[in-house]
Design a protein with these regions (language model features):
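Flexible "stalk/tail and boundary" regions
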Residues: 1-8, 12-15, 22-81, 85, ...
Length: 131
């Protein structure tokens, strides 16, 4: 389970090291990233991604426009990303732009996935959502 809040440094353009506690939950050399709903990036282990997206893929394709929209958003923007031996990876440029990440980022554990936020956006969201 992905837990905790971390503020790793960006290493160069979009390169970041996953915190060890997050990395320990991945159990592999690849992760799946996609855009989130609150201008953040969602991260999954490959198995976690399959478990998350499978129910969405079983929704009625022709009769449910909201299910189609969610499927498109989740899948069209998703990318499989390789981790190096230290758990470092490059966040795709389009995802950095979507989330507004330039200098500082925050990674939060969210149970079955983790999220990558621009730090100020996370702090603002947290202040509103948790007050």
């Amino acid at each position: 389970m992905f837990l905790g809040t971390y503020q790793p440094n960006l290493i160069g353009k979009g390169r970041v090291a996953l915190p060890k506690k997050i990395r320990n939950e991945i159990r592999g050399e690849r992760i799946v990233l996609t855009v989130g709903f609150e201008k953040c990036i969602l991260g999954f282990s490959e198995k976690g991604w399959e478990e998350t997206i499978s129910p969405e893929l079983s929704q009625p394709l022709f009769s449910d426009s909201k299910a189609r929209d969610l499927r498109r958003k989740m899948c069209a923007e998703a990318e499989v990303v390789n981790l190096d031996s230290q758990g470092r990876f490059v966040i795709p440029e389009k995802m950095l732009a979507y989330a507004g990440i330039k200098d500082e980022l925050t990674i939060i554990g969210a149970g079955d996935h983790f999220e990558i936020w621009e730090t100020k956006n996370w702090e603002n969201y947290r202040a509103k959502a948790f007050s």
